[in-house]
Amino acid sequence: HLCDRRQRQMCIRDRYLAYAEAANEAWGPKGDNGNGYSAYDVIKAIRKRAGIGGTSDPYLEQCAGDRDKMANLIRNERRLELCFEGFRFWDIRRWKENLNEPVRGIDWDRDGHSFNEFVVEERNYEDYMYYCPIPNSEILKFSNLVQNRGWK
């Protein structure tokens, strides 16, 4: 069934990227702890599948020796590979990135050669919003459960 196959493909990309992120955090860009695949290996395969870095991938090679650079590359790969699939909302919170970054858009001129950038939305998040509220129905079920700080 086509839909099932598409869902598996979407899921496997997330799993590969999650593994790359975890492997980089645990063992660095080229460490694999005996698993056979490092963060570097996984990202190289993902980029190769996308047609990036056929014979060489200078950006990947530049990041291969630095955990922080590799983490940034992996985050960017997640942004690109999983766009419009609902992961970005959770990734930004998990990484504790700035939630108040303005949402920007572009407006192409009629000639198609230039564009103007504009702010679509200004955001006003507070620190407690990194965590979602616990549904009240769950709090009512479990008397020892306390609502996340900042939520009522």
Language model: regions and residue ranges:
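Conserved small-residue hinge/capping positions at short loops/turns
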Residues: 80-84
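Single conserved hydrophobic/aromatic residue that forms the stacking wall/gate
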Residues: 1-4, 8, 12
